[in-house]
């Protein structure tokens, strides 16, 4: 380290004032702290939880390893967890999503300086390689005292959970399987990390798995992984599916996306959206936010869907429902939002208009066939960070690809705004408290937060926006068969 600038050429943690970390530049901490203070005013859910729980310290003793986009909003979450008594180590869950000033602010802490940081260990910087990303994930899960490993995981996308559970699985098998030639590049890096670690430590991940009391998962893709682990009998600790809390999925996924998709495309391309033909792949909560955002800009929007219910919803909102093959040749902008893989393949990319824009807002980079594009012989010119112009020599057509097929709203912009993330992160904090303080009540299965906690999060934010809720009379509550104070809807209610 030279001055405050952290070099990442050597993958070893930096240590200052007893804190190990690896970030871009500690001198950015003051800028990060200023933005963090503004964000706190826009995150009433987290600030309310600080006021409610600061004295009782419900997370005292919790050692939380967190894998979630290292943004300003996440910085407020991290400092909420520590304010409630937890110790925390952090890494980002995406190679492009870190806001370097936010990472610096968290390491330095509210009472430290770059020369004497007093914050939280963070291992994240914008523009990591895959090798750096998985190295950082391991550092986040590796606590200084081997006798006091992580005992809670806070995850987004399931990478931290997968690292622990797959690592334990391979340790018990006595071997890390070899990568196949056609495996994705990231899977090869993942297996190599586990293989290298197994050579020096035969039970690292097993010890961590046995210590972990639970995991709380932020996003749709990570929840899918959790259910797959549970179905296979491989889930070694309880999990709370935060994503399917109503105040997460119906707000973060839809309204957050509605804001940040446009921001990412504007910052990445400066292209006018109005009047353009836009194809949104997927019409779940995220896809709905995308389609609504594009419609609001005056675009002509079409949607692809596998589910007839979602497809009918799209048509009732005025969107054409088409197949990729039908629409790809006419689309000016294509956005994938399915949570699935192999949505836009090389043959689709080759059929796109000259200078059409292609991006993804699903969690992983496998919705767009980036590997096929890289093998195609197309030439790549980097226009600016996370904006690439790919040109096919046989046709002369060029395609603008955002964030290398990864989350464009975080790679090209700054992600979802603070207020909507306050909903999601309030749920995360409550879920961490729930699993930590009531661990005996949970088996190694996937759970959702109870309805009354969902309503609690919503109530905080309604009041913050100046709304006034109507209060049921006792007679009205009896008529509906609910309590005066709620919950007001059954679990099967679809908001």
UniProtKB/Swiss-Prot annotation:
It is found in: Cytoplasm. The keyword NAD applies. It catalyses: S-adenosyl-L-homocysteine + H2O = L-homocysteine + adenosine. Binds 1 NAD(+) per subunit. Substrate binds at residues 71, 156, 218, 248, 252. NAD(+) binds at residues 219-221, 253, 282-287, 305, 340, 361-363, 409. There is a cross-link at residue 474 (Isoglutamyl lysine isopeptide (Lys-Gln) (interchain with Q-Cter in protein Pup)). It holds the Pfam family AdoHcyase. GO terms for biological process: adenosine metabolic process; adhesion of symbiont to host cell; entry of bacterium into host cell; L-homocysteine biosynthetic process; methionine catabolic process; one-carbon metabolic process; S-adenosylmethionine cycle. GO terms for cellular component: cytosol; extracellular region; peptidoglycan-based cell wall; plasma membrane. GO terms for molecular function: adenosylhomocysteinase activity; NAD+ binding; zymogen binding. Its EC number is 3.13.2.1. SUPFAM superfamilies: Formate/glycerate dehydrogenase catalytic domain-like, NAD(P)-binding Rossmann-fold domains. Transmembrane segments: none annotated. Pathway: Amino-acid biosynthesis; L-homocysteine biosynthesis; L-homocysteine from S-adenosyl-L-homocysteine: step 1/1. Keywords: Cytoplasm, Hydrolase, Isopeptide bond, NAD, One-carbon metabolism, Ubl conjugation. Homotetramer. HAMAP family: AdoHcyase. Belongs to the adenosylhomocysteinase family. May play a key role in the regulation of the intracellular concentration of adenosylhomocysteine. This is Adenosylhomocysteinase. The gene is ahcY.
């Amino acid at each position: 380290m030279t001055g405050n600038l952290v070099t990442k050429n050597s993958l070893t943690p930096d240590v200052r004032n007893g804190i190990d970390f690896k970030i871009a530049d500690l001198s950015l901490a003051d800028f990060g702290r200023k933005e963090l203070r503004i964000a706190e005013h826009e995150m009433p859910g987290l600030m309310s939880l600080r006021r409610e729980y600061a004295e009782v310290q419900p997370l005292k003793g919790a050692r939380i390893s967190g894998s979630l986009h290292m943004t300003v909003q996440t910085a407020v979450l991290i400092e909420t967890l520590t304010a409630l008594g937890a110790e925390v180590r952090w890494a980002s869950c995406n190679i492009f999503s870190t806001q370097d000033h936010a990472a610096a602010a968290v390491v330095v802490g509210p009472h430290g300086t770059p020369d004497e940081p007093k914050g939280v260990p963070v291992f994240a910087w914008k523009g990591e390689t895959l090798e750096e990303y998985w190295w950082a994930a391991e550092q986040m899960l590796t606590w200084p005292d081997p006798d006091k490993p992580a005992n809670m995981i806070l995850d987004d996308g399931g990478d931290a959970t997968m690292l622990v559970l797959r690592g334990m699985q391979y340790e018990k098998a006595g071997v890390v399987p070899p990568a196949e030639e056609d495996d994705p590049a990231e899977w090869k890096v993942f297996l190599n990390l586990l293989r290298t670690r197994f050579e020096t430590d035969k039970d690292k991940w097993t010890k961590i798995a046995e210590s972990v009391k639970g995991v709380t998962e932020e996003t749709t893709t990570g929840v899918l992984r959790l259910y797959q682990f549970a179905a296979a009998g491989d889930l070694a600790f309880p999990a709370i599916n935060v994503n399917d809390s109503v105040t997460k999925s119906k707000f973060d996924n839809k309204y957050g996306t509605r804001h940040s998709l446009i921001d990412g495309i504007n910052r990445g391309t400066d292209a006018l959206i109005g009047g353009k033909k836009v194809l949104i792949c997927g019409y779940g909560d995220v896809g709905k936010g995308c389609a609504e955002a594009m419609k609001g800009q005056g675009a002509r929007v079409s949607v692809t869907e596998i589910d007839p219910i979602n497809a009918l919803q799209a048509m009732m909102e005025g969107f054409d429902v088409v197949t990729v093959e039908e629409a790809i040749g006419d689309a000016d902008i294509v956005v994938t939002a399915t949570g699935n893989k192999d949505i836009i393949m090389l043959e689709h990319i080759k059929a796109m208009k000259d200078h059409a824009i292609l991006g993804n807002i699903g969690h992983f980079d496998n919705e767009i066939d980036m590997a096929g594009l890289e093998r195609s012989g197309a030439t790549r010119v980097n226009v600016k960070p996370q904006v690439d112009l790919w040109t096919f020599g046989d046709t002369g057509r060029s395609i603008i690809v955002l964030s290398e097929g990864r989350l464009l709203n975080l790679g090209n912009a700054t992600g979802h705004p603070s207020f909507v993330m306050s909903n999601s992160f309030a749920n995360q904090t409550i879920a961490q408290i729930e699993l930590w303080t009531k661990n005996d009540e949970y088996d190694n299965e996937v759970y959702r937060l109870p309805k009354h906690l969902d309503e609690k999060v919503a109530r905080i934010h309604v009041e913050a926006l100046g709304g006034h809720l109507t209060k049921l009379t006792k007679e009205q509550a009896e008529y509906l068969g609910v309590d005066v104070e709620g919950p007001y809807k059954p679990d099967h209610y679809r908001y």
